[in-house]
Amino acid sequence: MGSRPCALGLFCCCSSCFCLCCPRHRPVSRLAAVVGGAAAVPAVVSGVTGLILSPSQSPIFIQPTPSPPMSPLRPGLDLVFANPPDHSAPLGVTRPSAPPLPHVVDLPQLGPRR
């Protein structure tokens, strides 16, 4: 999208940031008027979560915050599919990967405390 002059005579780059005084984003400009000179306020503009960055009173821009990369699989399932099971052992036979734990010694019970 090209740059178009906004109401303040500045240029609105709608692909990277949202100028709140631009006619395209005018419904959100009311939020900017309420916020005033806030440094960073969470906001949602056209479904994009961002921060209102306001170094001065005007203009106020919203810079979209990057979202984490989405994986088609649920977390943890990628490890299951990345490491296929080893079928060298017959079913029902376990092969422990760690040495067995030492036996626990039961301590005698102490008398009731008074």
Curated annotation (Swiss-Prot):
UniProt keyword annotations, A-Z: Host cell membrane, Host cytoplasm, Host cytoskeleton, Host endoplasmic reticulum, Host membrane, Host-virus interaction, Inhibition of host innate immune response by virus, Lipoprotein, Membrane, Phosphoprotein, Viral immunoevasion, Virion
Region ranges (Homodimerization, and interaction with host AMBP/bikunin): 72-114
Pfam families linked to this entry: HEV_ORF1 (PF02444)
Renumbered residue ranges of the record's region Disordered: 91-114
Major place of residence: host cell
Residue ranges annotated as motif PTAP/PSAP motif: 96-99
Subcellular location: Host endoplasmic reticulum membrane; Host cytoplasm, Host cytoskeleton; Virion; Host cell membrane
Region (Interaction with the capsid protein) residue spans: 48-72
A Gene Ontology cellular-component term: virion component
Residue segments, region Hydrophobic: 6-22, 33-53
Region (Interaction with host SRC, HCK, FYN, PIK3R3 and GRB2) location: 95-104
InterPro entries on file: HEV_Orf2 (IPR003384)
Phosphoserine modified-residue sites: S71
GO BP terms: symbiont-mediated suppression of host innate immune response
Post-translational modification: Palmitoylated in the N-terminus.
Membrane topology reported for the UniProt record: Lipid-anchor
Annotated region described as Interaction with host HPX, given as residue ranges: 28-68
UniProt function note: Small multifunctional phosphoprotein involved in virion morphogenesis, egress and counteracting host innate immunity. Plays critical roles in the final steps of viral release by interacting with host TSG101, a member of the vacuolar protein-sorting pathway and using other cellular host proteins involved in vesicle formation pathway. Also acts as a viroporin and forms ion conductive pores allowing viral particle release. Impairs the generation of type I interferon by down-regulating host TLR3 and TLR7 as well as their downstream signaling pathways.
Miscellaneous comment text of the record: The viral particles present in feces and bile are non-enveloped, while those in circulating blood and culture supernatants are covered with a cellular membrane (quasi-enveloped).
Family: Belongs to the hepevirus ORF3 protein family.
Oligomer and partners: Forms homooligomers. Interacts with host SRC, HCK, FYN, PIK3R3 and GRB2 (via SH3 domain); binding does not activate the kinases. Interacts with host AMBP/bikunin and AMBP/alpha-1-microglobulin peptides. Interacts with host HPX/hemopexin. Interacts (when phosphorylated) with capsid protein ORF2. Interacts with host TSG101; this interaction plays a role in viral release from the host cell. Interacts with host SIRPA; this interaction down-regulates the phosphorylation of host IRF3.
UniProt note: domains: The PSAP motif is necessary for the release of membrane-wrapped virions from infected cells.
Protein name: Protein ORF3
Source organism of the structure: Hepatitis E virus genotype 1 (isolate Human/Burma) (HEV-1)
Lineage of the species this protein comes from: Viruses, Riboviria, Orthornavirae, Kitrinoviricota, Alsuviricetes
